[in-house]
Amino acid sequence: MRQLHKQCAAPQQHDARRAARTVVRVASAEPVTSAGAAAANPQTDFKFACPICLTTEFVVQGSAPYQACRCGRCGRSFEAKGQYLDLTLTSGVAQQVYEQKMWQGTELFRQPLVSFVYERGWRQNFAGAGFPGAEKEFEMAMQYLQPAQGGVLIDASCGTGLFTRLFARSKKFAGVVALDFSESMLQQAQQFFAQDAALKAGTPIVAVRGDIGRLPFATGSVDAIHAGAAIHCWPNPQAAMAEISRVLKPGGVFVASTFLTPLAPLGELIGDSTVRPLSQTFNPFGRSNQTFRYWEEDELKDLVAAVGLTDYTRTRSRMFIMFAATKPAAERQPEQW
């Protein structure tokens, strides 16, 4: 049996023909569990993928500190910032001139002050829009995530790890990946992880800096993805949804919560299509001074359908919505001659 370890490990180089055959199965997010480990707290390896080629596998055991990962195929190393891995495209690169222009919603949550106050008052303000609170939202999400329990859960845009901790404490998953683009959010999350005694002997957590538009996982390798109060801050929601669909296994579940337009409560009474002309006034996504967007429910349905997810379902209250969808089984492809 392969020995478990705490560092990233790239697989040995293969010839081009062999690599082409193995692309579809490398970098699975499935855990590999030691047969000798205690059932209550198994040793779990997590598998990630190089964010450039998506084929080179990095194996990580769920405990920090981590070591840097190197992709021999791409000739690139990806940094480990002690308590989290950085698997973004610019990790380990000192760019001389080029700078990616960021969506303001992304940049806002990279500010250390925002990360500090997020669980110290910021998140609680969501109640005014109809969010029922973290504990209730967690319970709702767990209902949607039942088919994926026992697998690995990606808590995407995890922020300070509010839901990551709840998922790990539940012990319903083999492992939880806390994934966010914000360095300061991940640093704050690690502080909360260290302070939470209930996590010390529970479900393993790996913290990763990653781009929701370029997820560092292999195609069809992830059991479930949760994105709590996040999609309204994503710079390109359609591209992010395509990535989510790509990495989910057949039968994998995606669960997310977000803000509906301020007129959503009226829309529930008289129909969203009736209030749509007014709702669009509150949805100026293209304006550069906006940090997030409000959604119509039909827009979320469109995003889900466009990337091939099915079985859309939701819970809605005032401006709050939690929705879920499933990756269907792959259709049988005709044999190629």
How does the language model describe each region?
Residues 1-20:
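N-terminal chloroplast transit peptides
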Residues 30-108:
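N-terminal auxiliary segments of SAM/dcSAM-dependent transferases
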Residues 82, 88-148, 162-166, 170, ...:
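Conserved class I S-adenosyl-L-methionine
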Residues 151-214:
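Class I SAM-dependent methyltransferase SAM/SAH-binding core
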Residues 213-225:
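A short acidic, Gly/Pro-enriched loop at the edge of an enzyme's catalytic core
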Residues 223-237, 260:
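A short SAM/SAH-binding and catalytic strip from SAM-dependent methyltransferases
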Residues 238-250:
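A short glycine-rich, Lys/Arg-flanked "PGG" loop and its adjoining helix->strand segment in the class I
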Residues 255-323:
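C-terminal alpha-helical "lid/dimerization" subdomain adjacent to the S-adenosyl-L-methionine
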